[in-house]
C-alpha cells in the first residue's frame, strides 16, 4: 500500500540520511538495483558533511508529520532528537533565525535563512501537541521565531513584490537566491501563524 511505502521510505531515510548527532545530509545517492548507498551529499549547504539549515528544518517538520500520520513512536523520537540538535547547536543565533548553514565559516557574518526558521516554527507548534513533557518549550521557541521574523525580517507593505519576509537563502554555494524573499518562506510563515492562532484559541491543531 502507499502507507507501507511511505513508512518504509521514512525508515530508510532515518537510517541513511542522518549522522550520529541527528544532523542530516541533503541527498543520498542509491544504487537503483541493490538499494546500496553510493554517496551522501549536501548540495545546497556548505559541504557534504555540513548541516544545511533548511535541510535540518525539513527533517524536524517531516518526522513530526510522519508521527502525525502513523503514530509510530520511532518517528516522534526522531523529531525530538532533531529538535535537540537544532536548539543546542552552538551556532544557533540568539534570535533563532538560522544562518544558511550551521557550519558556515563566516558566522556571525553569514546570510540567514528565514525560510528555515519558518519551517522550524511551524513544526514546533505541531510537535508541542505530541510531546507534552517539552510542549511549553517548543511553543516558546516557536513564538520567539515568529516574533523575531515579524519584527526584524518582515517586508515593507506594498514593496518587495508582495512577499512577506526578507532574508532567505536558497542556494548559497552557487549564489542563487541569497538574502532574498522566497515564496516558501512566506508559506510556512503563514502556516506557523495560523497554527499559533489555533493553539491559542482552541489548545489543539487537529
Model-derived regions: residue spans:
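Glycan-recognition and catalytic cores of secretory/periplasmic carbohydrate-active enzymes
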Residues: 1-206
Amino acid at each position: 500500500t502507499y502507507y507501507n511505502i511511505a513508512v518504509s521510505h521514512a525508515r530508510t531515510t532515518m537510517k541513511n540520511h542522518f549522522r550520529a548527532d541527528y544532523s542530516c545530509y541533503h541527498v543520498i545517492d542509491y544504487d537503483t538495483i541493490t538499494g546500496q548507498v553510493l554517496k551522501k551529499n549536501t548540495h545546497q549547504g556548505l559541504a557534504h558533511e555540513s548541516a544545511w539549515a533548511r535541510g535540518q528544518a525539513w527533517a524536524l517538520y517531516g518526522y513530526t508529520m510522519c508521527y502525525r500520520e502513523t503514530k509510530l513512536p520511532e518517528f516522534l523520537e526522531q523529531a525530538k532528537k532533531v529538535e535537540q540538535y537544532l536548539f543546542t547547536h552552538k551556532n544557533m543565533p540568539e534570535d533563532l533565525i538560522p544562518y544558511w548553514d550551521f557550519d558556515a565559516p563566516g558566522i556571525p557574518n553569514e546570510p540567514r535563512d528565514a525560510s528555515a526558521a519558518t519551517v522550524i516554527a511551524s513544526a514546533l507548534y505541531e510537535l508541542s501537541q505530541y510531546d507534552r513533557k517539552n510542549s511549553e518549550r517548543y511553543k516558546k521557541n516557536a513564538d520567539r521565531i515568529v516574533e523575531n521574523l515579524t519584527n526584524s525580517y518582515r517586508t515593507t507593505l506594498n514593496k518587495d513584490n508582495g512577499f512577506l519576509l526578507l532574508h532567505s537563502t536558497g542556494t548559497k554555494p552557487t549564489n542563487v537566491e541569497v538574502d532574498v524573499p522566497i515564496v516558501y518562506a512566506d508559506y510556512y510563515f503563514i502556516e506557523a501563524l495560523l497554527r499559533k492562532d489555533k493553539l491559542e484559541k482552541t489548545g489543539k491543531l487537529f
